[in-house]
Amino acid sequence: MVTTLRQTDPDFEQKFAAFLSGKREVSEDVDRAVREIVDRVRREGDSALLDYSRRFDRIDLEKTGIAVTEAEIDAAFDAAPASTVEALKLARDRIEKHHARQLPKDDRYTDALGVELGSRWTAIEAVGLYVPGGTASYPSSVLMNAMPAKVAGVDRIVMVVPAPDGNLNPLVLVAARLAGVSEIYRVGGAQAIAALAYGTETIRPVAKIVGPGNAYVAAAKRIVFGTVGIDMIAGPSEVLIVADKDNNPDWIAADLLAQAEHDMAAQSILMTNDEAFAHAVEEAVERQLHTLARTETASASWRDFGAVILVKDFEDAIPLANRIAAEHLEIAVADAEAFVPRIRNAGSIFIGGYTPEVIGDYVGGCNHVLPTARSARFSSGLSVLDYMKRTSLLKLGSEQLRALGPAAIEIARAEGLDAHAQSVAIRLNL
């Protein structure tokens, strides 16, 4: 049964707070098993990868090789429908152009004392991209993770992807080449994360790891963090649609189901001020559910985690939307643009009835790797900046040191750090 919350109910605040705190996935306690895998890969390298791949993916890497060859990628292009390849090229080009606008500029200036300050940006040298296998092996995710790295100037982009029973999604290989991925390895799970972090005889280590994965992959990313950087630990997908009665209920229902079909733990929320419209959308959802290939997944998601929130008016929707802090926020109301400046917390905002979130998934150009589970309150979607580092610059001459040095000495001595004070004083003959 879909959850319905009415703002006019006296216990609405209590129910809404409980709704916000609800968990959509059970965290498996896999840390001990994952730590054993990570430690073994760190010790044994390729030997451990071969063993785990036989056990978990039923593939003999001694026969296939760990690395995916150029010939295999060529074959993937031959197998891929030409229309799909063209669509992926369009997506790639739009992602590239949008992310190029995110490139930061170096800055250097001289202040009133003559001190030179500034910062410069450099790309991370090597990054690893984890791509899940099976039903979650999406070529669009390859583009979304790899293209910002390419735009940032990352020298080496390494992709790992499991090959259950020896099978790789050809479109994933196509997307990898289109995005400029440097190396591809047919390994997955926690063992692939460990290989990227520590290196093996075949796989050289990287400096940062990005990409989604299951509980084992997420645990491995947490374990290796510090040795390498990571992007985020993403949860199930979610959408909040704020819509008025002038929308076509079938359109809104389709958008809700586009999230629901991702995962049984995905969440689709409708927020409206019109109960009759809400009922019409719910009826449209039920009609459309039975037309989907992933009916079982979408039905479970909508039944267990779907929600309708009835507000008194759309002015009340804004603070509620900010508290939900949805990964995806669709605003389909008469003056959608007026809402946008007042939304503080959302991973990505889709403005107007002709901007379904699905366009953002594929060809809009914005990144679809976004914060979930209310983490949009404090974090952002993947961007070029995730593949870059900022280094501060500072330059003083003798005059500037004489002007600033005494204050530095004073603070150092107050903190009991004599060597700090001496580092400046010795230059000033103090």
Curated annotation (Swiss-Prot):
Recorded family membership: Belongs to the histidinol dehydrogenase family.
Binding-site residues for NAD(+), renumbered to this chain: Y130, Q191, N214
Manner of cofactor binding, per the entry note: Binds 1 zinc ion per subunit.
Active site: E327, H328
Annotated keywords: Amino-acid biosynthesis, Histidine biosynthesis, Metal-binding, NAD, Oxidoreductase, Zinc
Residues the entry annotates as binding Zn(2+): Q259, H262, D361, H420
Protein name: Histidinol dehydrogenase
Function: Catalyzes the sequential NAD-dependent oxidations of L-histidinol to L-histidinaldehyde and then to L-histidine.
Catalytic activity: L-histidinol + 2 NAD(+) + H2O = L-histidine + 2 NADH + 3 H(+)
Example GO biological process: L-histidine biosynthetic process
Cofactor: Zn(2+)
Keyword Lyase (UniProt): no
Coiled-coil ranges (or none): none
Superkingdom in the source lineage: Bacteria
